[in-house]
């Protein structure tokens, strides 16, 4: 129930006494930022934290400013089943996942006014899908299943984070095990990897790599309502220290595969490795069927003089590694 200016004053007060006692382990101070599209909070908190007598080198007395955003909370108390949903809810969910880019752009534009050198990292403290709990489970435990809809939400969101890595310095899915959009579900001694787990496994190659500028031509908007239209394909690209390019692609369509040509500048496809996560929109893994949805080798591509040509299946996440 705090106002942003009151919170900012408290933050300035308390951060004063969070001191660094080990120069080899510096304290990383994160200021509590906005929930979703509360842009006023971001603006007022930064204004008050940068206000004199704050020295310029203190960059607002913070190293990070958080943003908090879940897909699904906009539905209120009854958010809908994690596994029983229709095509309309598919596009509704993915449109809210795509909104992460707008949030980063608009919060980032405010941060740029106070911190043009981007010394303050945007910290997405919690993100992911929030559905209704599984029937028969404790509502307070927030245990939910995890389908290809969640996998695409993860792929979309991680691509957005990668493309904005100049500002986004940390992003935490909530949670990792048994809660909300978890990467692992457990039951006694048994464990199952969710579709989201495989997306994280595929996207690990972006971590520690350098962003590569990329763009898509011929992207179409798809959906069932004007306000919920999403791009049919979405991407991000990076290159590691050994010169290996990682391309992650998402096909948001439920019915249409996409014929794509990957055009590389100053690079030839000497070696290609690819894996795919694909399935029906309601497909998920259980303890009895733990590998119904899993990452598999992908071979439906051909080398060309300019790069690669491929068919991207509907409802899929693809990783390409080009050496």
Language-model features: where?
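Aromatic/acidic polysaccharide-binding cleft in carbohydrate-active enzymes
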Residues: 120-235
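Short, well-ordered beta-strand segments enriched in hydrophobic/aromatic residues
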Residues: 243-251
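A structural signal for short hydrophobic beta-strand segments in well-ordered beta-sheet cores
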Residues: 235-237, 301
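C-terminal beta-sandwich/jelly-roll accessory domains of carbohydrate-active enzymes
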Residues: 215-219, 225-230, 250-323
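Hydrophobic, well-ordered secondary-structure elements that form the walls
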Residues: 161, 171, 200, 247, ...
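Feature representing long, continuous alpha-helical segments
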Residues: 98-101, 105, 152-159, 194-198, ...
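Noncatalytic carbohydrate-binding groove/subsite architecture in carbohydrate-active enzymes
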Residues: 4-155, 218-227
